A protein has these predicted regions:
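Shared catalytic-loop signature of beta/alpha-barrel
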Residues: 1-114
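Extended hydrophobic packing segments that form well-structured cores
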Residues: 115-147
């Protein structure tokens, strides 16, 4: 099966992708497609086309919590990409409300309210965002390309 959609940013673009039968798995990215409300609309459209959901999620702990909770609320959810060892201080900045079981890498829904995480704001301030790589590509004609 073909999985795609991590760089798709609008409901209309997902509609075109699904209508073309271009994928079997939709990898919408909540941080790119317009947040939880728009992701819900994309998921409903995917379900109408019988397309599974596997949220794309290479971001941090807030995105992970949102992607997991969103996935658990969707009937066509099959798997979620997660990153847990992205930075050595991750456990210092957030207490996550879910556990990844080592056998099978299974995650169960958390039982806490909201996204189920607690953010340590003081610790977050110790690690300001720094862009490692400028994610902008220009073609020889000056057009902006996909990073």
């Amino acid at each position: 099966p073909i999985a795609t959609g991590e760089r798709v940013t609008s409901l209309a673009a997902f509609r075109d992708l699904f209508a073309a039968r271009a994928c079997a798995v939709c990898q919408l990215d909540i941080t790119h497609c317009g947040g939880l409300s728009e992701a819900r609309r994309v998921a409903a459209l995917a379900e109408a086309w019988r397309i599974s959901l596997a949220p794309h999620n290479p971001q941090g702990p807030v995105s992970t919590a949102a992607s997991l909770e969103f996935g658990f609320s969707q009937p066509s959810y099959i798997i979620c990409e997660t990153v847990h060892e992205d930075v050595p201080w991750r456990q210092d900045v957030v207490r996550e409300g879910f556990v990844v079981e080592q056998k099978g890498r299974i995650v169960r829904p958390n039982t806490r309210p909201g996204l189920g995480i607690e953010i340590n704001e003081a610790e977050v301030r110790k690690h300001p965002f720094q862009q490692e790589l400028l994610q902008r590509v220009f073609g020889s004609d000056g057009s902006v390309g996909d990073w």
